[in-house]
């Protein structure tokens, strides 16, 4: 899956992964990340999610990373925000109070960019990637995060043979495999969500689960 794929999805407004509401799992479980006002949270492959503004409204410093320039521009335009724009190590950096978005390749992210980061929130990053990229993504994320970190991860699982992703099925054992090295993993929620996901129903998917994990290292 190449960068051109995601640029085309945004250019053609094929963004079914974008939610027009704050993610309810985030609202329910943000407190489990034990963040204090002013601490930084990373949102990888963030798109233009409404969760960015909501997290900032909770008093957090939000750092999003997104490949698509259109997604980043749309986020600020739709929130009537006027960011300062400059360059940072190959990224185009957009900044307003409480929110910094780095537009560019996630795999160019370096540990020094996350030196102040306390936690991450992944709702649509891991499940957006095919298997060969998921392992690379999870490895890079762990390499650049500070040693002591927490994470809130949302995944879906379904019979992958019944539908081509994205979003892709990421079963529980895969999550635990990616984060086996020094992370404590707690499943916070798991439920059947097939009935409220028409895209999966239309394609004949027989079951669909959504799960939420708390990850902690250090």
From Swiss-Prot:
Positions of S-adenosyl-L-methionine binding: 10, 45, 66, 123
Swiss-Prot/TrEMBL keywords: Cytoplasm, Methyltransferase, S-adenosyl-L-methionine, Transferase
S-S pairs: none
PROSITE patterns, A to Z: SAM_MT_TPMT
Record-linked Gene3D superfamilies: Vaccinia Virus protein VP39
Substrates-to-products reaction catalysed: S-adenosyl-L-methionine + a thiopurine = S-adenosyl-L-homocysteine + a thiopurine S-methylether
NCBIfam families, alphabetized: PRK13255.1, TMPT_Se_Te
Family: Belongs to the class I-like SAM-binding methyltransferase superfamily. TPMT family.
Location of this chain's protein in the cell: Cytoplasm
Name by which UniProt lists this protein: Thiopurine S-methyltransferase
Molecular function (Gene Ontology), one example: thiopurine S-methyltransferase activity
Example GO biological process: methylation
InterPro entries: SAM-dependent_MTases_sf, Thiopur_S-MeTfrase_Se/Te_detox, Thiopurine_S-MeTrfase, TPMT
Broadest EC class assigned to this enzyme: transferase
PANTHER family: THIOPURINE S-METHYLTRANSFERASE
